[in-house]
Curated annotation (Swiss-Prot):
Protein name (database record): Molybdopterin synthase sulfur carrier subunit
Known pathway: Cofactor biosynthesis; molybdopterin biosynthesis
NCBIfam families from the UniProt entry: moaD
Keywords in alphabetical order: Molybdenum cofactor biosynthesis, Nucleotide-binding, Phosphoprotein
Pfam family of the protein (one): ThiS
Species: Bacillus subtilis (strain 168)
GO CC list: molybdopterin adenylyltransferase complex
Lipid biosynthesis recorded as keyword: no
GO BP terms, alphabetized: Mo-molybdopterin cofactor biosynthetic process
UniProt gene name: moaD
Top-rank taxon: Bacteria
Length: 77
């Protein structure tokens, strides 16, 4: 299982802050594409990704037992 944590607007759009996916291995790009399709998360394309509390680059490999945090850009004034 890979644990996915969603923050801010992404969590609101998905209706949850945490999702577990039953996969042994995936890339961060595959996870983002799957969540975009399943939950309609259009803003996920601009989100930062952290795996096990460390920011990673696009298309990083993720394995079962990892935690992936998807953090959208923050705006305000």
């Amino acid at each position: 299982m890979i644990k996915i944590l969603l923050f801010a607007g992404l969590a609101e759009q998905a209706g949850t802050q945490a999702i577990e996916i039953d996969m042994e291995q995936a890339t961060t790009d595959e996870i983002k594409a799957s969540l975009k399709e399943q939950y309609g998360l259009e803003s996920i394309d601009t989100a930062m990704i952290a795996v096990n509390e460390s920011y990673v680059k696009e298309n990083t490999s993720v394995s079962s037992g990892d935690t992936v945090a998807i953090i959208p850009p923050v705006s305000g004034g």
